[in-house]
């Protein structure tokens, strides 16, 4: 599995995300694409003795969407933001998954604009997998929307069913 990681959107800088990626590729059978300012990322990889780690690649992006920016406006304006670039990698099948610790709103907006929606689904939903002794349960939205209408609840049920089925193919 190849995972794109938006390392620039977080409040605390890319250090922990780059370190986590290094630890992940050394412990698990995965590859990681670090998306963000390549100069900063490469310096961190050197610091963590991972500059030659072949399961890590760096994909440069020159912009960042900050937590205080309006997600939809920022995603449209900042075409080279790390979350937008990472979403394009996912859309173009250059990775299998995407992780971001940045603005949730920006991640959702980038996914909506870059990946689209399931036909008939009006509102996106955030899925939270919860591991348990008997398997994994997926909770949709986890309190993110307080104004959901009945039709949105039905659409959320469809979305979580689709997500669960795709995850277990």
Which stretches of residues belong to each language-model region?
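Short helix-capping segments at alpha-helix termini
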Residues: 25-28, 46-55, 166
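Short glycine/serine/threonine-rich phosphate/pyrophosphate-binding segments
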Residues: 13-17, 82-83, 104-111, 149-150
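Short, glycine-/small-residue-rich phosphate/pyrophosphate-handling segment
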Residues: 131-162
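Phosphate/nucleotide-donor binding subsite
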Residues: 50-95
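N-terminal phosphate-binding or glycine-rich loops at protein starts, especially the Walker A/P-loop
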Residues: 1-40
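Short, acidic/small-residue loops that bind anionic groups at enzyme active sites
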Residues: 110-142
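Short beta-strand segments
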Residues: 6, 35-36, 59, 100-102, ...
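Conserved small/polar residues in nucleotide/adenosyl-binding loops
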Residues: 163-169
């Amino acid at each position: 599995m190849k995972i794109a990681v938006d390392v620039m959107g977080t409040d605390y800088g890319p250090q922990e995300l780059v370190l986590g990626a290094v630890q992940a590729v050394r412990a698990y059978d995965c590859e990681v694409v670090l998306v963000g300012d390549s100069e900063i990322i490469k310096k961190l990889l050197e610091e963590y003795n991972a500059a030659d780690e072949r399961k890590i690649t760096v994909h440069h992006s020159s912009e960042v969407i900050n937590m205080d920016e309006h997600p939809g406006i920022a995603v449209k304006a900042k075409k080279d933001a790390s979350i937008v670039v990472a979403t394009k990698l996912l859309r173009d099948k250059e990775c299998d998954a995407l992780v971001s610790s940045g603005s949730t709103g920006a991640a959702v907006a980038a996914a909506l604009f870059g990946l689209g929606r399931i036909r008939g689904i009006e509102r996106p939903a955030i899925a939270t997998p919860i591991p348990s002794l008997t398997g994994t349960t997926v909770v949709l939205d986890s309190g993110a929307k307080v104004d959901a209408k009945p039709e949105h609840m039905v659409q959320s049920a469809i979305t979580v069913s689709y997500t669960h089925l795709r995850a277990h193919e």
